[in-house]
């Protein structure tokens, strides 16, 4: 389920007065700034899929994720490499709240085998577990998102979050060399 542009987003917001793409320290601002963040669709999409197709209890589905976030998971070699990729370090280092998640309190990277505990994520997942999508798009989680956005010149507002609706789209189909190809229709990412 796709993210949506915030209501304050405009067609030309990434262009300077000469119509050229604005860059920041990391790269084009359209890819690497808080203004590029769309209103997340995953939570609403998962709830829609569960309502349409699910047979298990919602809270039971979310419970293992809450537990893993709170108790932690071991850092794998892949996660260690991902967190220490120079590009990602630039992204994660932009905001103290990101650094707090992806690096130890000392600022050092997590090493393979270290336990990665995400208490804040556990709290967010618990709100979703107890309240469905409203646990994300309203209440404390929505307040935390919009507070961060406001403090860091982002665009997402409480109205953006509360207006988000997941859209079920019909997949596109075609055949190629005796194979049926099924993919996401536009707009999609990697579809």
Give the label of every model feature segment.
Residues 1-132, 136-138, 142-188:
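Noncatalytic scaffold domains of N-terminal-nucleophile
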């Amino acid at each position: 389920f796709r993210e949506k542009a915030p209501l304050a987003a405009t067609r030309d917001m990434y262009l300077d007065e000469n119509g050229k793409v604005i860059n920041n320290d990391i790269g084009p601002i359209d890819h690497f700034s808080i203004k590029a963040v769309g209103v997340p669709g995953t939570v609403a999409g998962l709830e829609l899929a569960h309502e349409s197709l699910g047979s298990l209890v919602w809270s039971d589905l979310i419970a293992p994720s809450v537990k893993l976030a709170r108790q932690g998971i071991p850092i794998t070699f892949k996660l260690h490499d991902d967190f220490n990729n120079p590009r990602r370090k630039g992204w994660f280092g932009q905001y103290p709240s990101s650094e707090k998640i992806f690096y130890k309190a000392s600022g050092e990277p997590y090493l393979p085998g270290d336990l990665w505990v995400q208490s804040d994520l556990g709290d967010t997942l618990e709100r979703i577990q107890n309240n469905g999508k409203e646990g994300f798009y309203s209440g404390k989680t929505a307040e935390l998102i919009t507070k961060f956005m406001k403090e860091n010149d982002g665009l997402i507002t409480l109205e953006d979050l509360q207006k988000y609706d997941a859209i079920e789209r019909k997949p596109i189909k075609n055949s190629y060399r005796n194979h049926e190809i099924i993919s996401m229709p536009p707009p999609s990412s990697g579809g």
